[in-house]
Design a protein with these regions (language model features):
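Surface loop/turn motifs at the tips and blade-to-blade linkers of beta-strand repeat domains
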Residues: 24, 107-112, 156-159
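Predominantly five- to eight-bladed beta-propeller fold
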Residues: 5-33, 41-99, 103-107
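Beta-propeller blade signature
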Residues: 1, 91-99, 142-151
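Beta-strand C-termini and the immediately following turn/loop, strongest in propeller blades
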Residues: 1, 31-34, 43-49, 83-87, ...
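Local beta-strand/beta-hairpin segments that build beta-sheet-rich folds
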Residues: 2-5, 74, 153-157
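Long hydrophobic segments that form regular secondary structure
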Residues: 97-134
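Loop/turn position at the start of each blade in beta-propeller repeats
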Residues: 28, 88, 111-116, 137, ...
């Protein structure tokens, strides 16, 4: 059966388990939640994009699908779009116990402008892997979190003078 996990989601303000524009485009991230191996918990990233500036994108008639309402004049599509150097979404990681319906915010020491580009439960349902990057992207941390206690411990840290380069 289905049931609502969060209640604070709001268009152009708070996204739960669905990445914002930066995460979709820059981290190829389209699912910001994961289930534990025993299916008893869900972990998700919360994106507070309330302070991110809006951007207006022109919308034309086009094709596939054709938007006939814009045949004569273009319309616009407004969305949260942080340009370089402006405020990004504030992110936090949460766990939700499906049986008890308790939500916990992970005690993750992520910078206020940092990124959480991935979360993934391990085969052990008591261990949630959380990957973080600072805004400059020259420090990567892999945390192992206990989704029931919300305690996070650094497992790996990688730092570089310029930026962390993804290995192909």
């Amino acid at each position: 059966s289905e049931s609502q996990v969060t209640k604070d989601g709001e268009y152009n303000k708070v996204l739960n388990g669905i990445p914002d524009w930066v995460y979709e485009e820059e981290f190829s991230y389209n699912r910001a939640f994961d289930f534990s191996a025993d299916s008893k918990m869900i972990a998700y990233v919360r994106f507070d994009e309330s302070q991110v500036p809006m951007y207006s994108f022109p919308w034309y008639k086009g094709m596939a699908p054709e938007k006939t309402e814009y045949t004569t004049y273009p319309g616009s599509y407004d969305y949260k779009y942080p340009k370089a150097g402006v405020v990004n979404s504030k992110v936090s990681v949460h766990s939700f116990d499906i049986k008890s319906r308790v939500t916990r915010k992970m005690e993750l020491p992520v910078d206020s402008d940092g990124y959480v580009p991935r979360i993934k439960f391990t085969d052990d349902p008591e261990k949630l892997a959380i990957m973080t990057l600072n805004r400059h992207q020259n420090r990567f941390d892999l945390y192992m979190a206990n989704p029931r206690s919300a305690i996070c411990k650094v497992a790996i840290r990688d730092e570089a003078e310029q930026y962390i380069k993804e290995q192909a």
